[in-house]
Amino acid sequence: MASTTNGVNGHKASQPQSLIQTLNNIGADSFSNDGERIQAVLAAYALVSRLETPWEFVARTCMGQPALGAALKVAKDLKLYDKWHELGDGEMTCEQLSELVSCDSALLFRILRHLAANHVLEETSIGVFKPTKLSISFTVPVFGEWINHLYDATTPCFFKMPEFLAQNGYKNPVDPNNGVFQAAKGWKGDMFDYYKSHPVEGASFDHVMGGVMANQAGWLEIFPHNKLLETADAQSPLVVDVGGNIGHDIERFRQEHPETASRLYLEDLPEVVKRSKCPDDVNKVGYDFFTPQPIKGARAYYMHGVLHDWSEEPARKILEMQKEAMKPGYSTLLIHDHIAPESLAHPHTTAYDLTMMVMVAGVERREAHWRALLKSAGYKLVRIWRSPLAVQGVIEAELDQ
């Protein structure tokens, strides 16, 4: 007698098709808030891992993903995303697109087909393609420059990582002047010096960092920033953004509290702060955070993504350089960074950790790691602020009296 249950785990054959249809109908607008959407993304990652066979995993990881990166880069170099966008992002045939970007149509079809197979483009019919929200986003530098950065930096570094680690006895990289980045790029000096000497790649890197800042939950969504105003001396500096790049975070604060602009300070190396987008009434200070902090007695000293660039010894020195400027019992240190869980870390956190390792010999720290680092530099951890919308958190610390 034939079985009537020939589906998934013995369920009726019609049920898997219904399940697949349900999955195909799920989109970002299926969720009431971004926290639920993020949880669904993680669940989808886990679902793929449960469904894939070993062969499907290696085919995707070892062929599909490298090929996707290359296809994205070729399309970027051809200015495909930008030129298509200028024409209104409508459906176009492969032949029309090949004329648009001056590329052999047979070659371009192979590129377009892989982009469509990975949902970067939509193939509406045979040989006809349409942009998606994702591909249109590549016309904006904070997304599009990630493709250049992939080939300028991350791919060369990860390609070199196994060889470098083997040659160095599999020791944890801690020297920002002698790591994977230097081996990959043939460079003497740290990554930041490299970008100063290579301004085109440096400008691309700035856009990448802008994308990091702009597309994660900001510190104002994580930390109760109003309490800084409620407890601040109106005549003293309010917030000092230490190593704040061109001012993405301090500008968010200024927009929320415009009356405080003259008491806000953006600090980074002189050549960086001169590119700041902040209004003139925000103070811009050229500052090397390995030297004593020049702005004294601020209510808060804020660091976003600074300390993960550095291993223990330099990170400790950066923290120590802020201490003399801080007013005991008043000044707060705010560290906005990844706080890796002891287990089951978010894949973005683990990816950041390995990226920091190969680029700058940095590290994404666990909570116990942060506590030990702060204590060694003369601070005590007051509280860790988190949000379900963010893989990063804000560590609130003060001087340990």
From Swiss-Prot:
Residues engaged in binding S-adenosyl-L-methionine: G243, G244, D268
Keywords, comma-separated and alphabetical: Methyltransferase, S-adenosyl-L-methionine, Transferase
Catalytic-site annotation from UniProt: H308 (proton acceptor)
Pathway: Secondary metabolite biosynthesis; terpenoid biosynthesis
Keyword match Cell inner membrane: no
EC number: 2.1.1.-
UniProt superkingdom: Eukaryota
Pfam families in UniProt: Dimerisation, Methyltransf_2
Biological role: O-methyltransferase; part of the gene cluster that mediates the biosynthesis of the phthalide-terpenoid hybrid 11'-O-desmethylfendlerol. Within the pathway, mfmE catalyzes the 7-O-methylation of the phthalide 5,7-dihydroxy-4-(hydroxymethyl)-6-methylphthalide to yield 5-hydroxy-4-(hydroxymethyl)-7-methoxy-6-methylphthalide.
Family: Belongs to the class I-like SAM-binding methyltransferase superfamily. Cation-independent O-methyltransferase family. COMT subfamily.
The protein's name in its UniProt record: O-methyltransferase mfmE
Organism: Annulohypoxylon moriforme
